[in-house]
Amino acid sequence: MSQEKDVRLEDVAESKAELDDKARKMLEDKDADSRMRIYEGPLGKAIIVLLCVWTAFQLYFTTIGAISAINLRAIHCIFLLLFTFLLFPTYKKEKRRRKLPPIWDWVFILGSIGSFTYLILNYTRIAQTGGRISDMEVGIALVAIVCVFEAARRASGNLAILAAVFLAYNWFGAYLPGYFGHNGFTLKRVLITQFWGTQGVLGTGIGVSATYIFLFVVFGAFLKHSGFSKFINDFSLTLVGRTSGGPAKVAVIASGLMGMINGSAIANVATTGTITIPLMKRTGYKKEFAGAVEAVASTGGQFTPPIMGAVGFVMAEFLNLSYTYVALASITPALLYYVGLLLAVHFEAKRLGLSGIAKENIPNAMVVIKEQGHLVLPLVSLIGLMFVGFTPLYAAVISIFVTIGASWLRKDTRMGPDKILGAVVEGSKSAISVGVCCVIIGIIIGTVTLTSMGLNMGYLILSIVQGDHIYLAGFLVMIMSAILGMGVPGVAAYVIVQAVAVPVLIKAGALPLIAHLFCLIYACLSNITPPVAMSAYVASGIADSDQTKTGLWAVRLGLIGFIIPFFFLDNPVLLIGVDKTATLWESLWSIFTAMIGTFALVAGLEGWIIRKAGVIERVILIAVSPLLLFPGSLTDIAGIAGIAAVCIFQWIRRK
């Protein structure tokens, strides 16, 4: 049934306040950040001052300030735990507005500050003695671990449970057989690793939070307060708003770009979904489809260059590679993911006979560029500075100041003191929950390191696949990544997964960068993978749709994201700059044919090319799509021939 009437933005504007409230309630259930306490009186003002002090500390000591890595991480932990116990409620239904925190929170605050301050003052002495600690220092470590777990319970919930299982594995693993077993460890040995060393709570996870994550979250907040999100939305409208199913395409572009910057798929759904989902429903899309489009678009931003939600910088750090190298390799998966999603919403619009947004609601492209184009300068600055040799940390800090300067190029976008303060407060608050996740991840990584779990899992999977079966190993890692990443922010999910799953893929024969990228994508896709699928479920709340159906639609729309990692797992030519034996032309041709394969797969799933596709046509399209996703001349010819045959047959039928 055709619906040719254009959609008017004012038709959905009146419901936005109601949807904002619904999104807020969904976030309060799924996302701890939205449940933060609101203090009245002097304490509220003091917290704002402390957030500003924390931001200044991070900006200074991650760039030009001199401080040891262990002290930077420990002080970062102190700030994280302090703000967690001040701002995050003890339980979900706790009253948000208050004058003071409960007495037990002061106990946790004192325990956190005291234990980590003692570590700062005594770390060098303990390190010089080979990690020998007294009974009192065992107690101090226990206090710190308890505080970390309580903070993680409030900020991330499920991750604290997972970390508790890993921590317990240090002891009960001694009673397990085979690859899962180990010799067991004393309490003191575990605490030396988890607190007094650099493999536990003060290890890689918190190191990432104290540098890349904090700076790029704050950078994203400055971009938001400068009006960059409005520019993205307006520019997306000018690009695709008038096309068939325009609102869904606007959602894909705008949500993808914003997700790339803020790194939280769930928060991104709640922010952009209140605008895009009602528009899609008004256009004629099913409510489950509308919610799924928003969830899938927001999720992909976490592995989309140039920012990748800060995950790319973390990956570069782990691999000891240039970020440019990581970003180039990430282009193909992100490109195919969003091409597939755009094609899906286009074919669905054609199948349903949907129109675009009314012409009078589409801003003039030249006016948008003239009035808001200067807001792109911070991103240009970030990319340009890294290209000429600046570290990502320096580039991020400089780009924050560029954001302020660029906003002053036009009166209506100027960031005055209030907007700057708002960006600092919002950015630092947003960094808390992710930071706490990174602290508790240290427990997981510390356990993996101490017990050799990563190596043992690798040996186990290789014994199951029995030989050089990289794809079967990849399938098992995919499941592992999806499980470990469920309900965890993108960066944190990747840090967990890479500790356990990357060694498995490398042992199976994958290149290190490919192994990391493989795990990253599946860790991010856990946001749309049932039964958890947190992004899809938040979107379903806004769309007022069935959660299970929305989650299943999200998997279908994001299917290319689940498939493409297997095609580059043993075929690095698909990733730009990874295969040193391939020419640029070979890489570009492989990407081009992969896009055609994506077209065939989506067309087959949606049942539309030129017109509605029959069952046989759909089967042919789905069957030939893998031939084009795998690099190879013969497979390319066969795949293109299959698609051409279907297109010719459809054209003849249309006549």
Where are these regions (language model features)?
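Transmembrane alpha-helix interface/packing and boundary motifs in multi-pass membrane proteins
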Residues: G220-K224, S255-S264, V296-Q302, G442-I445, ...
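Membrane-interfacial loop-to-helix junctions in multi-pass transporters
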Residues: D135-G139, G200-Y212, T238-V252, T283-F289, ...
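Hydrophobic transmembrane alpha-helices that form the pore/transport pathway of multi-pass ion
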Residues: N233-G301, I307, V311-V314, N320, ...
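Long, contiguous bundles of hydrophobic transmembrane helices that form the permeation core
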Residues: S2-K45, L328-S430, M534-P626, R654
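Core transmembrane alpha-helical segments of multi-pass membrane transporters/permeases
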Residues: F149-A155, V165-F166, N170-G173, Y179, ...
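Conserved, well-structured core domains of diverse proteins
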Residues: M1-G131, E137-I145
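Alpha-helical transmembrane segments
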Residues: R73-I78, G207-V217, Y325-G340, T391-I400, ...
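Long hydrophobic segments that form regular secondary structure
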Residues: G373-L513, I521-Y522, V602, R611, ...
